[in-house]
Amino acid sequence: MPKGDGKLVAQNKKARHDYAIEETFEAGIVLQGTEIKSVRNARVNLKDSYARIDKGEIFLHNMHISPYEQGNRYNHDPLRTRKLLLHKKQISRLIGETKESGYSIVPLKMYIKDGYAKVLIGVARGKKKYDKRQDLKQKEAKRDIERAFKERQQ
C-alpha cells in the first residue's frame, strides 16, 4: 500500500468483488519508454489483468496502458506482458501459495511511490456466487445503518 506520498494511478475494484484476497505484496514493474508517461497521466486499466509465474519470474498479463499521446512511433503495445519485480523469497512464497488449486495472483492497485511505478498484487481465491451476494447484503446493511445514524444526529 502506498505509505505517505504514493499517488494512486489505478485501482481494480472488480478484484475485491470477484476474489477473496488472502495476502498482498508490493511489486515494482518494468515499463518501457512512453509507458511511464501514460502511467503518470493515470491512463491505466487493471480490470481484466492477472499475474503468472514463468521460469521463476512473475509477469503481469492483460494490463492496458494507453499509448502516450505525444509518443508517435515510440509507443508500445498497450496489452504487452510486463515483468514484476519482487525479492526471490517473495517469488518462492507466491509459487508455493499459487500451486494450491483455486489460488491466483491479481493486481489490486497501481501507484507511484518515490518516483517509481508500483503494483499491489494479491494472492486471491475466487468467490462463489453466494459469497458475492452475502458481501453485497452486508455492505447494503452497513450503508443503511450509517444512513439511519446520520439522520438521528440531525
Swiss-Prot record:
Main location: cytoplasm
Pfam families for this protein: SmpB
GO terms (BP aspect): trans-translation
Molecular-function GO term, any one: RNA binding
Swiss-Prot/TrEMBL keywords: Cytoplasm, RNA-binding
Region entry Disordered, spans: 131-154
Family label: Belongs to the SmpB family.
NCBIfam families reported for this sequence: PRK05422.1, smpB
PANTHER family in UniProt: SSRA-BINDING PROTEIN, TMRNA-BINDING COMPONENT OF TRANS-TRANSLATION TAGGING COMPLEX
Protein name as annotated: SsrA-binding protein
Gene for this chain: smpB
